């Protein structure tokens, strides 16, 4: 489904190995008693993950409402590869244990031994988790940890459209700002236009939340007319109405596909690879900012203002990463990008080799203004700032070193 390199070929193995330790580090130490209500699950030793093959795959699919399959290449004979595969299995086993009562099953499909089954199921990308629910197939493009995978699958179990029926639910809807969201106003669940909307929602579930209301009072507060659908870009206050209501499923899907890359979007554990692979000409504009930190919050607010002022520019897309969401990756990012993530940063990253160049802050105590940030972004979009310039500087430094040796 996705053939692009994930954060660079060399970066992938390190990144994935780091993510695998989440399960181990997140498990309470043995001998430490948790209070009632805070008893974290520990693997009970029961094998629940199924090796799916040509003989059993039909029965496996009949057994579970939702089935998550890890499509993997055969582990190599060396100790490190064997250990890594065991850890991946353990992550799936713990997730299977937690979700056993929810009717969620887990399986393994070997890309060599079970190639025929993989072909029938449409599995194409090794080391990916494919989730099957009814007629829908969802590729999980998130962090490979038990907690994140469980959270994702719980979302999969939810209905693709959430109904807004009162003031509190409306307030909760309005508080969602860090992801795309849609809301439509329809006569009832039996409306053919609502059913088209629901079918469209299934295409993006659970990555993009779809909401609907049948309440005229709620619709009035949202300035929605009957059968009208509003699309909210992430971090944008004002929606865009999908034109030519009432809309068919195909029209809704097409509109979302065309507009799903927000001007400012947040890297999230449950969709990190999907976001990273959606680059513009092989690069990302990346901003690091801790929302809980005063400087990070101020910088993020400036980013939001710049994004809102430039939302009509299809060439501008900024990925915001909150380091607090990825503590295990902070040392890796600091080393790879040669930056200090204790302070806000913004730069350009080449997705192929992770080469990067970062905005110089004139004064560490004075963060860039919206105008300064816009000027820098304009230089990036015009190609005046790019990672190749940084390579040239490195070459010059190497030449200087050679001269010193002479």
Swiss-Prot record:
Post-translational modification as stated in the protein's UniProt record: N-glycosylated.
Keywords attached to this entry: Calcium, Endoplasmic reticulum, Glycoprotein, Membrane, Metal-binding, Mitochondrion, Muscle protein, Phosphoprotein, Sarcoplasmic reticulum, Signal
* Positions of modified residues (Phosphotyrosine): 43
Known glycosylation sites: 350
Any one Pfam family here would be Calsequestrin
Can you provide one Gene Ontology molecular function annotated for this UniProt record? calcium ion binding
Localization (cell): Endoplasmic reticulum; Sarcoplasmic reticulum; Sarcoplasmic reticulum lumen; Sarcoplasmic reticulum membrane
Phosphoserine (modified residue): where? 81, 216
Source organism, top-level taxon: Eukaryota
Where do the record's region annotations for Disordered lie? 382-406
**Membrane topology value:** Peripheral membrane protein
Where expressed (tissue)?
Detected in skeletal muscle and in smooth muscle from vas deferens, aorta and stomach (at protein level).
> Does the record carry Lipid biosynthesis as a key word?
no
Q: Which residues carry this modification: Phosphothreonine?
A: 124
GO terms in the biological process aspect are: endoplasmic reticulum organization; positive regulation of release of sequestered calcium ion into cytosol; positive regulation of store-operated calcium channel activity; protein polymerization; regulation of release of sequestered calcium ion into cytosol by sarcoplasmic reticulum; regulation of sequestering of calcium ion; regulation of skeletal muscle contraction by regulation of release of sequestered calcium ion; regulation of store-operated calcium entry
Q: Which InterPro entries match?
A: Calsequestrin, Calsequestrin_C, Calsequestrin_CS, Calsequestrin_middle_dom, Calsequestrin_N, Thioredoxin-like_sf
Q: Which GO terms describe its cellular component?
A: endoplasmic reticulum; I band; mitochondrial matrix; myofibril; sarcolemma; sarcoplasmic reticulum; sarcoplasmic reticulum lumen; sarcoplasmic reticulum membrane
Task: Kindly indicate where the leader peptide sits in this chain.
Answer: 1-34
Function text: Calsequestrin is a high-capacity, moderate affinity, calcium-binding protein and thus acts as an internal calcium store in muscle. Calcium ions are bound by clusters of acidic residues at the protein surface, often at the interface between subunits. Can bind around 80 Ca(2+) ions. Regulates the release of lumenal Ca(2+) via the calcium release channel RYR1; this plays an important role in triggering muscle contraction. Negatively regulates store-operated Ca(2+) entry (SOCE) activity.
- Outline the subunit composition: Monomer; increases in response to a depletion of intracellular calcium. Homodimer. Homotetramer and homopolymer. Can form linear homooligomers. Ca(2+) ions promote oligomerization. Interacts (via C-terminal end and preferentially with the monomeric form) with STIM1; this interaction increases in response to a depletion of intracellular calcium, decreases both STIM1 aggregation and clustering, interaction of STIM1 with ORAI1 and store-operated Ca(2+) entry (SOCE) activity. Interacts with ASPH and TRDN.
Q: Which family is this protein grouped under?
A: Belongs to the calsequestrin family.
Q: What is this protein called?
A: Calsequestrin-1
Q: Which organism is it from?
A: Rattus norvegicus (Rat)
Q: What is the lineage of its organism?
A: Eukaryota, Metazoa, Chordata, Craniata, Vertebrata
């Amino acid at each position: 489904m996705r053939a692009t390199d994930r954060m660079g070929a060399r970066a992938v193995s390190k990144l994935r190995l780091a993510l695998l330790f989440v399960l181990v580090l997140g498990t309470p130490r043995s001998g430490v008693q948790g209070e009632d209500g805070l008893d974290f699950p520990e693997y009970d030793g029961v094998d629940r993950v199924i090796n799916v093959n040509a003989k059993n795959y039909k029965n496996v699919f009949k057994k579970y409402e939702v089935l998550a399959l890890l499509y993997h290449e055969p582990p190599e004979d060396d100790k490190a590869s064997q250990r890594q595969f065991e850890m991946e299995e353990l992550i799936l086993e713990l997730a299977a244990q937690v979700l056993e009562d929810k009717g969620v099953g887990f399986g393994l499909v070997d890309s060599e031994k079970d190639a025929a089954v993989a072909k029938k199921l449409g599995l194409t990308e090794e080391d990916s988790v494919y989730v099957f629910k009814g007629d829908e197939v969802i590729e999980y493009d998130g962090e490979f940890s038990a907690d994140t995978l469980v959270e994702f699958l719980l979302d999969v179990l939810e209905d693709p459209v959430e109904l807004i029926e009162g003031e509190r639910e409306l307030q909760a809807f309005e508080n969602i700002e860090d992801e795309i969201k849609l809301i439509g106003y329809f006569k009832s669940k039996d409306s053919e236009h609502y059913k088209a909307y629901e079918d469209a929602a299934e295409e993006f579930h659970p990555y993009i939340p779809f909401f609907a209301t049948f309440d005229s009072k709620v619709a009035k507060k949202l300035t929605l007319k009957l059968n009208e659908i509003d699309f909210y870009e992430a971090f944008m206050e004002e929606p865009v109405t999908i034109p030519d209501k009432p809309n068919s499923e195909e029209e809704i899907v097409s509109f979302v596909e065309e507009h799903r890359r927000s001007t400012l979007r947040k890297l999230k554990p449950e969709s990190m690879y999907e976001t990273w692979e959606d680059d513009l000409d092989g690069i990302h504009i990346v901003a690091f900012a801790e929302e809980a930190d005063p400087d990070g919050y101020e910088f993020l607010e400036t980013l939001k203002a710049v994004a809102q002022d430039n939302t009509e520019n299809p060439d501008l897309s900024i990925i915001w990463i909150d380091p607090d969401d990825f503590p295990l990756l902070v040392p890796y990012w600091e080393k790879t990008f040669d930056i200090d993530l204790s302070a806000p940063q913004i730069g350009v990253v080449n997705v192929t080799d992770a080469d990067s160049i970062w905005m110089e802050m004139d004064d560490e105590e004075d963060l860039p203004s919206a105008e300064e940030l816009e000027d820098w972004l304009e230089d990036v979009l015009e190609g005046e700032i790019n990672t190749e310039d940084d390579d040239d500087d490195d070459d010059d430094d190497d030449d200087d070193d050679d001269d010193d040796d002479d």
